[in-house]
């Protein structure tokens, strides 16, 4: 919820709402009105997830990650195909947009840029077939994106690459990105992304958050129990 809160407001939950308790609570209410969070303290089958989304008449559904779903047969390959087919039917019959997040296979996680390349030693973005389970996910999906970040690059670690690998419906203007020309999203202050220097959500933010920055050393009750793991610690010289 912390990161969703930040991107919802374009401000830092841990720094910009220390005195604006009303704005803080209003934002929490907005988020809980728009999102239903499925508890992560147990595992679900794909059918159970779809039933939950149908129960709440959701406009959209995110399954993250796919490998967290329980299996119901010994033939995982065929079950994956069946699951993808069931998700497509669910989308068509309920008009629910569904996103499925999946990880790379192990070999793809070893695929780095070669010597003398400008990104030498950094991980390459995944292809469609590099998904756990293989090409079948791209085959069954209407659209397929590879989201990549070179987390160990000294300058580009905060830039997310969005490679649009497949777009089924192109007649309305959609298309894939060109090879090696992804959409670049620059991460700023843990609460915003910009594309080509522009924040596409700039006009959607509510006027909430502290206006007076002199109180940044203060902590209100709702922030005292917040996890400090949401943001990186200050840099130091220790090797660990």
Model feature map: region roles:
Residues 1-2, 69-72, 107-112:
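Short acidic/His/Gly/Ser-rich catalytic and metal-binding motifs that mark active-site loops
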Residues 1-56:
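Cytosolic-facing regulatory segments adjacent to core modules
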Residues 6, 43, 67, 104-105:
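Active-site-proximal loop/turn and secondary-structure-junction residues that shape catalytic pockets
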Residues 10-11, 15, 46-58, 92-94, ...:
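C-terminal regions of RecA-like/P-loop NTPase motor modules
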Residues 20-27, 42-48, 76-86, 127-133, ...:
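Helical mechanochemical/support elements of P-loop NTPase systems and associated helical scaffolds
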Residues 36-93:
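Phosphate-binding/switch loop-helix module in NTP-utilizing enzymes
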Residues 62-63, 96-103:
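Structural recognition of the conserved hydrophobic beta-strand(s) that form the central parallel beta-sheet
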């Amino acid at each position: 919820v912390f990161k969703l809160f930040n991107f919802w407001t374009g401000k830092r939950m841990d720094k910009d709402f220390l005195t604006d308790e009303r704005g803080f609570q209003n934002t929490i209410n907005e988020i809980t009105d728009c999102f239903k969070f499925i508890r992560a303290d147990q595992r679900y089958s794909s059918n159970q997830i779809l039933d939950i989304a149908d129960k709440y008449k959701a406009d959209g559904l995110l399954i993250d990650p796919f490998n967290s779903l329980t299996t119901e047969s010994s033939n995982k390959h065929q079950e994956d195909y069946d699951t993808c087919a069931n998700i497509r039917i669910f989308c068509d019959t309920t008009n629910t947009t569904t996103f499925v997040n999946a990880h790379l296979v192990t070999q793809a996680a070893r695929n780095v840029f070669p010597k003398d390349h400008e990104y030498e030693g950094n991980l390459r973005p995944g292809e469609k077939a590099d998904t756990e389970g293989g090409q079948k996910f791209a085959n069954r999906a209407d659209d397929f994106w590879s989201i990549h970040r070179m987390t160990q690059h000294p300058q580009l670690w905060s830039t997310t690459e969005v490679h649009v690998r497949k777009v089924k419906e192109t007649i309305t203007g959609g298309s894939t990105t060109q090879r090696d020309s992804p959409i670049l999203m620059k991460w700023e202050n843990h609460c915003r992304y910009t594309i080509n220097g522009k924040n596409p959500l700039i006009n959607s933010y509510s006027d909430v958050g502290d206006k007076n920055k002199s109180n940044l050393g203060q902590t209100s009750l709702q922030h005292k129990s917040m996890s400090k793991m949401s943001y990186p610690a200050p840099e130091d010289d220790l090797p660990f």
